[in-house]
Amino acid sequence: PVSEKQMTIVLKEDTELLDEVVVLGYGANTRKQDLSASVGIISNTDELAARPVTSTESMLQGQLPGVTIQADGGDPTSTPNIVIRGQGSQNGDNVLWVVDGVPGAPITSMNDIESIVVLKDAASAAIYGAQSGAGGVVLVTTKKAKEGAPTLTYDGTFGFRQATNLIEPLNAEEQVEMRRRSYENAGQALPDGWNVTKNPWVGTTRTDWMDAIFRTAFYQRHNIALNVGTDKSSSRLSLSFDNDQGTLINTYKKNLALRYNGKMQLNKWITISEDLVWKNTTSRSKETDNDAYTGPILSAVYMPASATIYNPLDGSYGGTTTEDPAYIEKYGSNFADAHGDAVNPVRLLEAENLYNKTSDVWSTTSLEIGNVLPGLKFVSRFTYNLQNYYYKKFNPIRDEVGKPNLSNNVQEQSYRMDAWKTENTLTYDNTFGKHTVGALFSTTADHYSKRGLEAIGKDLSSE
């Protein structure tokens, strides 16, 4: 029965949420109730870090309205693309990542993240100028050293990933029937290569090529952190290791990283801090973002189901049809022209992969002066980045039936990159009665240099 008793519901403002402080960049803070720009805030990062994902970008999936995460292929080195309310910026349509106030600084581990703020529109991102544009900005704050008894924590994640909603190519029997109907509808005779009476090889399914190139991939993440702190100084040291197998065979990405954060309060006005990051990444990959005709995924669609991964005669990679001399003698041909110039996708992944190794060192030293005048704060920050990079790509001779390439080549390159950035920021934020006043003045200078060596060799005598 419906109750006749009247109920009165009163909604009240949550002043705690309205008074929440939001970091907008360059150390500028504002209360949430004073925001006029579109900003998304994620503070439950510990829960998100436990999600079965392998990148910080994927961790944001479904967490904020207007933020879309797009992942491509099964390559573990492919970084998911973040689209914030559309695209368009001088930074290649990608959003700008700012970690602890430093644009482009690395994130060593998802477990090291304290909070994430996404600046969604051009107005809020304009503080970073042409680096971001309309693409937006993602501000990441990492966990800092805290006062208290020494603590040692460990976080570990294990899991498996599989590619889903894969294209289902036709089997051999369906391919033959499709060809028969297409030639019949065109009023043309069926070529001998698609006639199972004259070429029985084409009518038997031997390989599911999608199953051949994709796998159940294992990933693991480990993070161990030590925190030691007093009321005057504190330090936090974390070590992380990530190992991500790609869902495409013979692809992987491994990260080993060390992050140190230390802070010392010299007196009631002056605080100095140091952030040091070392990150080493090795990977083996295959380009899938722009999967051309000879890319592994499209090749798995084009490759005939009657073909084999390996040649049963000698164990070499199989082509579009048989190379058995006895078969060719019996039927007069192997009818290679029936399948065009398709490429064995397993060979593309096993023999032609890219190898990358990157070593990064980031050092950020900060000086903060505050409490001299109410609401006034000065921060001077100097960041140095040293990166060493190595890349190797080898394309062997491809002589199997299909689309041969009788010329091999190898490409190697390495470079060293040095960069520094200095920022000096003066901020003022104070409240007078019902009025809040905020101001920011900042100067930035940066330097970037890169030196490298690249070598390409063709038609090598041995592989």
Give residue ranges: language-model regions.
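Surface-exposed loop/interface segments of Gram-negative outer-membrane beta-barrel transport/assembly proteins
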Residues: 17, 33, 147-206, 246-251, ...
